Amino acid sequence: MNAEITRFFEVLESYEHLLHAETQAIAAKDIDLVEEILAKKDLCMADLLTSKENLGSDPREDAKINSLIDKVIELQQRNYSIFSSLVEDQRNKKSGKSINSSPNKYNKLRQTYLDMDKSRISNLWD
């Protein structure tokens, strides 16, 4: 692998590690940690996009990278699904309480997953 491909692979691996950390934070229902990891993921994604721009070819042509990309996308989708379920559970728990007690943090984090800006993994291959 040339230096640019190696760099891309390393950053992609970092993103994968963040996804695993995010999975654990979601499972622990540690919203502050999830929010912190989301910020780190955004920085890592920006680095990944920059690294991708420096490549002379499609990184998916490399079987090892292609496999990791698929894994990252799968992890991202799984985390989104699990987090959406968590938000829905919280919404259901809070439905009997006053409107003022609804958790804005959950909605904010859910919206982070729905945002369609350049920091989202779905836009990496567009």
Model segments located where?
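A structural signal for well-ordered alpha-helices, especially hydrophobic packing surfaces
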Residues: 16-19, 23, 45-52, 73-83
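Short, hydrophobic secondary-structure boundary micro-motifs
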Residues: 34-35, 60, 92
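Short, solvent-exposed, charged loop/turn and helix-capping segments
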Residues: 51-67
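Long, hydrophobic N-terminal alpha-helical segment
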Residues: 1-40, 45
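Short terminal interaction segments
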Residues: 64-126
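A structural signal for long alpha-helical coiled-coils and helix-turn connectors
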Residues: 23-27, 49, 56, 87, ...
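Juxtamembrane helix-loop transition sites at the ends of transmembrane segments
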Residues: 37, 48-51, 57, 95, ...
